[in-house]
UniProtKB/Swiss-Prot annotation:
Principal location listed in the UniProt entry: host cell
Protein name, per record: Per os infectivity factor 6
Membrane topology type: Single-pass membrane protein
Function: Per os infectivity factor.
Amino acid sequence: MVFIIDTQRHFAHQFTTNPFVIFSNLLGATGHSHAFYKRLTATFSRQRSFGRHIAVVDMWESIRWQILNGDEIEVSPEHRSLAWRELIINVASNTPLDNTFRTMFQKADFENFDYNTPIVYNLKTKTLTMYNERIRAALNRPVRFNDQTVNVNIAYVFLFFICIVLLSVLAVFFDTNIATDTKSKNVAAKIK
């Protein structure tokens, strides 16, 4: 795999085929080791070591990045379309098949989406910053309770109805038993 990065266009692109030493050429090209590059290398190496991040990190290795500032990198403009498509596909494929999850996915949002919108990765917080509010809301988990997401199984409704009928029958039966029980005690008391 090849990881390409353009560091503020100060020098030529640096290539490496070893995913664990992503920025070794970049560190050598600057003449001294910046803490930023070390943190960037450590972040990607740490994410690669976890099993659940492998697909996402492999996806980002084919994307070209450029440095914005000391804490942020962004996808270069010619790779934004690919990055957005890969990100949306990975998030959608890792989503549980449940109606309460990712309810804001709409076909029109993806057909009319501007795939040149920047994607910024913050190295300190390890988060992606997205400037499209609709896509951000669709890719994040729901934060508010929505009455449309409540799933009611018909079997539960039927069981609830049976329980209500049984409780009503039991209440009437015990109420009549108590009434007849007190009447028989009153009759027995009068006979004595």
